[in-house]
Curated annotation (Swiss-Prot):
Protein name in the entry: Temporin-SN2
Propeptide: 23-44
Keywords from the named record: Amidation, Amphibian defense peptide, Antibiotic, Antimicrobial, Cleavage on pair of basic residues, Cytolysis, Fungicide, Hemolysis, Secreted, Signal
Superkingdom assignment: Eukaryota
Compartments it resides in: Secreted
Gene Ontology terms describing biological process: defense response to fungus; defense response to Gram-negative bacterium; defense response to Gram-positive bacterium; killing of cells of another organism
Signal peptide: 1-22
Tissue: Expressed by the skin glands.
The keyword Transmembrane belongs to this UniProt entry's keyword annotation: no
GO CC terms: extracellular region
InterPro entries attached to this UniProt entry: Frog_antimicrobial_propeptide
Modified residues (Lysine amide): K61
Length: 61
């Protein structure tokens, strides 16, 4: 029983470190891609406008 607890504690500890490192790497990548956010906003606006236009055509108005 003690060995199982020890193993589970070790796995939990290593998993926590791994998640922390991945989160730091993801944050660094997001900081590098700051310019892409403006492009994403434009694409979302076009998508919403196209979606509304398509719904209006489908409804026949």
């Amino acid at each position: 029983m003690f060995t199982l607890k020890k193993t589970l504690l070790l796995l939990f500890f290593l998993g926590t470190i791994n998640l922390s490192l991945c989160e730091e790497e993801r944050n660094a990548e997001e900081e590098r891609r700051d310019g892409d956010d403006e492009m994403d906003v434009e694409v979302k606006k076009r998508f919403i406008t196209g979606l509304i236009g398509g719904l209006m055509k489908a409804l026949g108005k």
